Amino acid sequence: MAAAEQKKSYKVVKQFKGLNTKANRTAIEEDEFSWIENVQPIGYGNARVTPSYITSKDTGGNAVVWASTVSHLTSCNIDITDYVIAFQTNGSAQYYNIVTKATGNVAVAGTFSNAGVITSQWKNERMLILDPAKGYFTWDGNNVVSVGSVGIIAVTNTGSGYTGAPTVVIGAPIDSHGTQANATASVLSGAVALVSLDDAGSGYGVPPPSITISGGGGSGATAIAGVVTFATGTASAVVVSGGTGYTNSANTVVTFSGGGGSNAAGTAVLGGGQVKQVIMTNPGSGYTNAANLVVTVSGGGGTGAVLKGIVNSDVNCGIASFSGRVFIAAGRTIFYSAADSYTDFTSVSAGSFVLTDSTLHGNIQQILAANNFLYIFGDDSINVFSDVRVDTNGITLFTNTNVSASVGSKRANAIFPYFRSVLFLNDYGIYALVGSTTSKISDSLDGMFPNIDFSYPIYAGQVLLNNILCAAFNFRYFDSVFTNSYRYVQAVFFEKKWFITSQGDALQYVTSVPVSGLVTLFGTSGNSLYQLYGNASASITSRVQTALLPMSDPIRTKQALKIGIEATASNISSITMQATVDSENQQSPPYTLSSLVSWINNSLQVVVWKNNSNATIGWGQIGYNLYKTDASMYGKYVGITVTSSNPGYVYNGFEFEHELRVRF
C-alpha cells in the first residue's frame, strides 16, 4: 500500500458560481473564480465564452464612424424605429437607424453643450433632450426643436364691453418646426380677466410671441407672454413691493444691471396702482451672480416698487417622462409639465417642487421613471414620487417618500431599471433598489473598486447574453494582474453572479437598444460604433482563474501532478489554451493545451498537412474534449489560470491530480 503522502488525490470543479474579488484567492469558495473574463458562468459545468463585438455598418456596408468625439451615447424609439444617438463634443448629434442602417444628423455643431446632455422618451413620438445649460429640446426623427414654450400670459389691459369670450391668437413660433401655442380668454364683468394656455407649443424664443385678443363684443384688451426654455444663466424678477401710483404701463420701464450677464429685459404688469409682476421679454444670458443683479422700475407715474433679481444658475441634471408628464430636475427643484403635455410648464396642473429634505445633500443628480415610481437620486439619498393625481381645482398632487437616507449615486449614466428593481453604481459599490429596500449586490467586486478610474464616464445598461437578461456596467479599470494598464471592462451581473467582459480597451460609452425584440448593447470606441457581443465567431481573449484550492486539507503541502480542463466546442474544430498551475506563492510556466490531432507516419514522424494555399492546417474535433497535461507545482493551495483566444466554446470542468505532502 502506498504511503499516505504518495497517495494520488483528485479534485474536480464543475459548479461555477462566478467572480469573487472580495477575499484572497485562497479564501474564496472552491467553485468561485478570482477572475473570469469573457466567460459567462451560466451553471453547473457550463461556463460559456462570450461573443466579441462587431462593427456597425451603414447602408453602404461601411463602418459607422461619428463625425466628432462622442460625449454621450443614448438610444430612442420613434414610431417603430430604434436609433442609437451620439452627442458630440462640438455640440452636434448624429443618429444610427437600427432598422435601415442609415446614419444622419440630429443637430449641427453648436446646438448643444459639449458635455452633460441627457435624454428621455415621450411616448414613441420623440426624444426629449435636456442640455445642462442650453435648456430643453425634442427630436421627432426629423427635426430638433427647442422647447421654448409659451409661459405665463399676463393681461396688461382688461378692455371693456365683452359679452362673450374673445378669441386669443398667439404668434407663430420662431422655429419653423415648432408647434403652435393656443390660449383661451375668460371674461368677468365685461372685461378680460384671464388668458389661459390650452397648448404651450414649442419652438418659441426671443422675442416672445405676440398676443392678439379680438371679438367677444368688446375692445381694448391686451396681453403679453413670456417663454419657458430651462436655459441657465438667465435672469428674471419678482415683486418684493408693488409700490403706489403706477397707472401708465406704456412708460413703466424695468431695468436689469449687474449679475455678470447681459440683455435681460422685462415688462411690468400693473394693477390697482401697483406693479403686480414682471414678464420677461428677454431672459438674457451669461448671468451668474444674483447678489449683484439689480432690477429697478422707473416711470409709470408711481413710486416705491421694489423688485428682486433672480438668476437661473442651477444646472439641468435630469429628465424623465412619468405619469403622462415630463419631469425636469435642476438643482434641488423638480419641474413638471401639465398632464398629457411635454411642453406646458405653466398651466394650473404644471408646477415645481423643491426638495427640502435634509437627506438630500447638495443637489439632485439624476431622475428615473420605472416600476410606477419616479426615482430622485442624490449623491447619498433616494426619494420616490408616486400616486400622481389632479385634485378638483386642477392642481397636481403626488406623494414624496425618502427610501434611502444614506445611499445614492452621482453616476447618472449608471442608473437603470433591471426587472422590478433599479440598479445603480456609486463610488463604493453597486446596489439594487427593490421597492423601498436598497441592498448592495457587488460584494464580489470589492477588490476591483479601488482600481476603477472614476474620473472617466461610467455607463451601464441591460443586455441579453445566452438568452439571459444581464446588467452590464462599463468602466475604466487598472488591470494590475494581466495587462498592467488601464482598459475598459464590463462588470456583468445575472442571477446573483458576476463576471467580466472586455469588448474593446477604449470602449467609453454604451447604451441598450432592443433589436428585433432582443435587448442589445451598443458602444463607441474612439468614434466608431460597435454592437457588443454580436460576433460569435471572432477571436476573443478569455481568462479564467480558479480559486486556489486547499484540496480539503489546507495544512498539508500538495504536489500537483496533472491538470485537466473539460471543454466543449460546438462550432470550431480546435481549441488552444495556455494554462498555468498556480500556488499561493508562485506560478508555473504556461502549458499549451490543444485539441489538434497529430498525424504520425511509420517512421514516427509528424505529418504536416497543407491546403491549396500551401498553409498548414490542423485536425481537430467538434464536441467534448479533455485538455490535460502533466503539471509541476507545489503549495498549500493549488489552482489554474487559463487563457485562450478561441471563440464559441464552453468550459465544463477543471480537474486536478495531486499528492499530499508534509504538514506545515
Give residue spans per PLM region.
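Beta-sheet repeat architectures centered on beta-propellers
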Residues: 2-106, 110-128, 406-410, 417-421, ...
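Acidic/polar residues in short coil/turn loops that connect beta-strands
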Residues: 90, 133-134, 139-142, 330, ...
